[in-house]
Amino acid sequence: DMKYVQWYALTYLWCGEGKQEETYTYGSRLREPVDQVEEAIKNYVKEQNDRQVTMVIRLPEDIYKENPKTKEKHEPPCLSVIDTEILNDKMHLTCYFRSWDAFAGLPANIAGLQLFNEAFVNDINERTNLGLTTGKLVFHSKNCHIYKRQFNLVKDLLNPKSIEKSARLAKTLNAYKI
């Protein structure tokens, strides 16, 4: 669902505006306390051959499994790093995931990061006459997995027995915003 992907890219990757109960989004980590996206754009406006433009989402305190002060469970971000580089007038992103939900997270993350790259390139192009386009997206994951609760959905997706079953699966996926 492209509407979901656009919402995800804007809300969770580009702007960082999550739900009130969320302690962070990838975007909030990219934008605060240092606006890494803006600084990366400024770096490329000054020096297109800069190979040091890496945005880090993970924080040192993400090492804790629970907040030392509140004792609440803490889940570190799955996406840890977005490394960027301009080669042959194309912006390439290399992304590292600590953990990656192959069924629900992976499709939205890939599509969302493509839209992130398009917005990133657009902002650079608006400030320069480079005429960059998006390049390759490269993904690394330490642990890409499918949760047990998703097994039947994944089986149905890979081996649809009938059109009716496929339509039911599509409705289920749409309900999950996948």
Spans of features found by a protein language model:
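Terminal, non-catalytic protein-protein interaction segments that mediate quaternary/complex assembly
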Residues: 1-178
